[in-house]
């Protein structure tokens, strides 16, 4: 068995992994994407896919879509942490079914 060089625990040792799609509505302003991505990278969560688009110019809102993989506990933690970020208005989490 090869030991991982990662500072973070490897998900395969933690439990069953599921792929989730997060849709996050945020203020369309400088630095918001960095805060959202920083939440993932700072805790060692991998972003498999990322897309950002302005959705409402009048209300100055953008939608960030992130695909990630994690255990149910990790996904719940990500959801709670995203909801605490100041520029975040709404978080939707969808489990991807194969």
Write out the residue ranges for each language-model feature.
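A conserved regulatory-domain signal marking ACT and ACT-like small-molecule sensing domains
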Residues: 1-98
């Amino acid at each position: 068995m090869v030991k991982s060089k990662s500072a973070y625990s490897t998900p395969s040792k933690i439990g069953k992994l599921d792929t989730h799609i997060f849709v996050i509505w945020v203020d369309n302003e400088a630095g918001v994407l960095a805060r959202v991505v920083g939440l993932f990278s700072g805790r060692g969560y991998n972003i498999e896919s990322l897309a950002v688009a302005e959705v409402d110019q009048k209300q100055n809102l953008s939608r960030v879509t992130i695909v990630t993989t994690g255990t149910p506990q990790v996904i719940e933690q990500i959801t709670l942490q995203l909801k605490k970020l100041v520029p975040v208005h709404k978080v939707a989490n969808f489990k991807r079914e194969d």
